[in-house]
Curated annotation (Swiss-Prot):
The keyword tRNA processing does not apply. GO terms for molecular function: DNA binding; DNA-binding transcription activator activity, RNA polymerase II-specific; RNA polymerase II cis-regulatory region sequence-specific DNA binding. Residues 137-196 bind DNA. GO terms for cellular component: cytosol; nuclear body. This is Homeobox protein Hox-B7. The keyword Nucleus applies. A motif (Antp-type hexapeptide) lies at residues 126-131. Pfam families: Homeodomain. It comes from Mus musculus.
Amino acid sequence: MSSLYYANALFSKYPAASSVFAPGAFPEQTSCAFASNPQRPGYGAGPGAPFSASVQGLYSGGGAMAGQSAAGVYAAGYGLEPSSFNMHCAPFEQNLSGVCPGDPAKAAGAKEQRDSDLAAESNFRIYPWMRSSGPDRKRGRQTYTRYQTLELEKEFHYNRYLTRRRRIEIAHTLCLTERQIKIWFQNRRMKWKKENKTSGPGTTGQDKAEAEEEEEE
Protein backbone atom coordinates (compact mmCIF):
# COMPACT_ATOMS: atom_id res chain seq x y z
CA MET A 1 0.00 0.00 0.00
CA SER A 2 1.07 3.55 -0.67
CA SER A 3 1.80 6.19 1.90
CA LEU A 4 -1.02 8.30 0.50
CA TYR A 5 -3.52 5.67 1.59
CA TYR A 6 -2.38 5.98 5.20
CA ALA A 7 -2.50 9.77 4.98
CA ASN A 8 -6.06 9.74 3.67
CA ALA A 9 -7.12 7.32 6.39
CA LEU A 10 -5.54 9.57 9.03
CA PHE A 11 -7.28 12.74 7.84
CA SER A 12 -10.59 10.93 7.53
CA LYS A 13 -10.27 9.72 11.12
CA TYR A 14 -9.58 13.24 12.40
CA PRO A 15 -11.84 15.56 10.41
CA ALA A 16 -10.90 18.58 12.53
CA ALA A 17 -7.50 18.64 10.89
CA SER A 18 -8.99 19.39 7.49
CA SER A 19 -10.23 22.78 8.64
CA VAL A 20 -6.72 23.93 9.46
CA PHE A 21 -5.49 23.93 5.89
CA ALA A 22 -7.18 25.79 3.05
CA PRO A 23 -9.02 23.71 0.46
CA GLY A 24 -6.82 22.75 -2.45
CA ALA A 25 -3.58 23.12 -0.55
CA PHE A 26 -2.86 19.41 -0.91
CA PRO A 27 -4.14 18.19 -4.30
CA GLU A 28 -4.86 14.51 -4.31
CA GLN A 29 -2.26 12.58 -6.21
CA THR A 30 -1.55 8.94 -6.46
CA SER A 31 1.77 7.31 -5.90
CA CYS A 32 2.29 7.13 -9.64
CA ALA A 33 1.89 10.89 -9.92
CA PHE A 34 4.79 11.45 -7.51
CA ALA A 35 6.98 9.16 -9.55
CA SER A 36 6.07 10.58 -13.01
CA ASN A 37 6.03 14.31 -12.17
CA PRO A 38 9.56 15.65 -11.62
CA GLN A 39 8.28 19.07 -10.52
CA ARG A 40 5.99 18.45 -7.60
CA PRO A 41 3.41 21.08 -6.65
CA GLY A 42 3.99 22.83 -3.38
CA TYR A 43 7.76 23.14 -3.80
CA GLY A 44 7.74 25.88 -6.38
CA ALA A 45 6.98 29.58 -6.06
CA GLY A 46 3.57 29.52 -7.69
CA PRO A 47 1.73 26.40 -6.51
CA GLY A 48 3.23 26.52 -3.03
CA ALA A 49 1.72 29.88 -2.13
CA PRO A 50 -1.55 28.53 -0.67
CA PHE A 51 0.38 26.10 1.50
CA SER A 52 2.69 28.78 2.88
CA ALA A 53 -0.29 31.03 3.59
CA SER A 54 -2.05 28.26 5.43
CA VAL A 55 1.06 27.58 7.51
CA GLN A 56 1.31 31.25 8.44
CA GLY A 57 -2.34 31.23 9.44
CA LEU A 58 -1.71 28.20 11.57
CA TYR A 59 1.10 29.87 13.56
CA SER A 60 -0.37 33.36 13.56
CA GLY A 61 -2.59 32.57 16.53
CA GLY A 62 0.36 31.26 18.54
CA GLY A 63 2.24 34.54 18.54
CA ALA A 64 1.28 35.18 22.15
CA MET A 65 2.89 31.93 23.21
CA ALA A 66 6.09 32.76 21.38
CA GLY A 67 6.91 35.47 23.90
CA GLN A 68 6.52 33.16 26.86
CA SER A 69 9.47 31.33 28.30
CA ALA A 70 9.78 27.56 28.13
CA ALA A 71 9.56 27.29 31.90
CA GLY A 72 6.33 29.27 31.91
CA VAL A 73 4.78 27.09 29.19
CA TYR A 74 5.60 23.82 30.93
CA ALA A 75 4.64 25.21 34.32
CA ALA A 76 1.23 26.26 33.04
CA GLY A 77 0.68 22.82 31.53
CA TYR A 78 1.55 20.98 34.74
CA GLY A 79 0.15 23.44 37.27
CA LEU A 80 3.55 24.55 38.59
CA GLU A 81 5.11 27.95 39.05
CA PRO A 82 8.19 28.96 37.03
CA SER A 83 10.18 29.38 40.25
CA SER A 84 9.70 25.69 41.09
CA PHE A 85 12.13 24.72 38.31
CA ASN A 86 15.02 26.38 40.19
CA MET A 87 14.32 24.74 43.56
CA HIS A 88 16.94 22.05 43.04
CA CYS A 89 19.68 24.63 42.53
CA ALA A 90 19.49 26.14 46.02
CA PRO A 91 20.92 23.15 47.99
CA PHE A 92 23.68 22.71 45.43
CA GLU A 93 24.74 26.34 45.75
CA GLN A 94 24.73 26.07 49.54
CA ASN A 95 26.90 22.96 49.44
CA LEU A 96 29.20 24.61 46.94
CA SER A 97 29.72 27.59 49.22
CA GLY A 98 30.68 25.24 52.05
CA VAL A 99 33.72 23.89 50.16
CA CYS A 100 34.81 27.29 48.87
CA PRO A 101 38.45 28.23 49.77
CA GLY A 102 37.30 31.47 51.31
CA ASP A 103 34.89 29.80 53.73
CA PRO A 104 35.73 30.96 57.30
CA ALA A 105 34.50 27.69 58.81
CA LYS A 106 36.89 25.67 56.69
CA ALA A 107 39.78 28.02 57.48
CA ALA A 108 39.07 27.70 61.21
CA GLY A 109 38.98 23.90 60.94
CA ALA A 110 42.30 23.85 59.11
CA LYS A 111 43.86 26.08 61.79
CA GLU A 112 42.62 23.79 64.57
CA GLN A 113 44.00 20.75 62.75
CA ARG A 114 47.37 22.45 62.36
CA ASP A 115 47.46 23.42 66.04
CA SER A 116 46.62 19.86 67.09
CA ASP A 117 49.42 18.50 64.89
CA LEU A 118 51.91 20.91 66.45
CA ALA A 119 50.76 19.93 69.93
CA ALA A 120 51.17 16.24 69.09
CA GLU A 121 54.69 16.87 67.81
CA SER A 122 55.61 18.79 70.95
CA ASN A 123 54.37 15.92 73.15
CA PHE A 124 56.40 13.39 71.16
CA ARG A 125 58.86 11.64 73.45
CA ILE A 126 62.50 11.98 72.42
CA TYR A 127 64.92 9.36 73.72
CA PRO A 128 68.62 10.11 74.33
CA TRP A 129 69.75 8.25 71.19
CA MET A 130 67.33 10.30 69.07
CA ARG A 131 68.88 13.66 69.93
CA SER A 132 71.11 15.45 67.48
CA SER A 133 74.82 15.51 68.27
CA GLY A 134 76.02 18.17 65.83
CA PRO A 135 78.57 20.87 66.69
CA ASP A 136 75.87 23.55 66.73
CA ARG A 137 73.81 21.74 69.35
CA LYS A 138 73.72 23.58 72.67
CA ARG A 139 74.54 21.21 75.48
CA GLY A 140 72.57 21.51 78.67
CA ARG A 141 72.98 20.09 82.12
CA GLN A 142 71.94 16.46 82.23
CA THR A 143 69.39 15.68 84.91
CA TYR A 144 68.96 12.18 86.27
CA THR A 145 65.90 10.72 87.85
CA ARG A 146 65.84 9.43 91.38
CA TYR A 147 65.86 5.83 90.20
CA GLN A 148 68.83 6.44 87.87
CA THR A 149 70.80 8.22 90.59
CA LEU A 150 70.10 5.42 93.06
CA GLU A 151 71.28 2.73 90.65
CA LEU A 152 74.40 4.69 89.72
CA GLU A 153 75.28 5.28 93.38
CA LYS A 154 74.81 1.59 94.06
CA GLU A 155 77.14 0.70 91.19
CA PHE A 156 79.69 3.28 92.31
CA HIS A 157 79.65 1.83 95.81
CA TYR A 158 80.87 -1.53 94.50
CA ASN A 159 83.16 -0.28 91.75
CA ARG A 160 84.37 3.24 91.07
CA TYR A 161 85.64 2.39 87.57
CA LEU A 162 83.56 0.64 84.96
CA THR A 163 84.55 -1.38 81.97
CA ARG A 164 83.01 -0.62 78.59
CA ARG A 165 80.88 -3.74 78.71
CA ARG A 166 79.50 -2.77 82.10
CA ARG A 167 78.81 0.78 80.91
CA ILE A 168 76.79 -0.58 78.00
CA GLU A 169 74.74 -2.77 80.34
CA ILE A 170 73.98 0.10 82.72
CA ALA A 171 73.18 2.46 79.82
CA HIS A 172 70.60 0.02 78.43
CA THR A 173 69.15 -0.61 81.88
CA LEU A 174 68.75 3.08 82.78
CA CYS A 175 67.94 4.35 79.23
CA LEU A 176 71.09 6.48 79.14
CA THR A 177 74.08 6.73 76.83
CA GLU A 178 77.60 5.51 77.50
CA ARG A 179 78.83 9.10 77.52
CA GLN A 180 76.33 10.04 80.23
CA ILE A 181 77.38 7.07 82.37
CA LYS A 182 81.04 7.91 81.89
CA ILE A 183 80.56 11.59 82.78
CA TRP A 184 78.52 10.73 85.84
CA PHE A 185 81.23 8.39 87.17
CA GLN A 186 83.93 10.98 86.49
CA ASN A 187 82.03 13.63 88.42
CA ARG A 188 81.25 11.17 91.18
CA ARG A 189 84.91 10.23 91.55
CA MET A 190 85.88 13.89 91.78
CA LYS A 191 83.28 14.39 94.48
CA TRP A 192 84.48 11.32 96.33
CA LYS A 193 88.06 12.58 96.26
CA LYS A 194 87.05 15.93 97.69
CA GLU A 195 85.07 14.27 100.43
CA ASN A 196 87.91 11.96 101.45
CA LYS A 197 90.68 14.50 100.77
CA THR A 198 92.91 11.94 99.21
CA SER A 199 95.75 14.13 97.97
CA GLY A 200 98.61 11.67 98.44
CA PRO A 201 101.00 11.04 95.52
CA GLY A 202 100.45 7.28 95.59
CA THR A 203 96.70 7.51 95.48
CA THR A 204 96.76 10.06 92.65
CA GLY A 205 99.01 7.86 90.54
CA GLN A 206 96.79 4.84 91.17
CA ASP A 207 93.66 6.73 90.14
CA LYS A 208 95.39 7.99 86.99
CA ALA A 209 96.44 4.47 86.01
CA GLU A 210 92.92 3.17 86.59
CA ALA A 211 91.47 6.04 84.51
CA GLU A 212 93.79 5.22 81.60
CA GLU A 213 92.81 1.56 81.83
CA GLU A 214 89.13 2.57 81.72
CA GLU A 215 89.68 4.67 78.58
CA GLU A 216 91.38 1.76 76.80
CA GLU A 217 88.56 -0.64 77.64
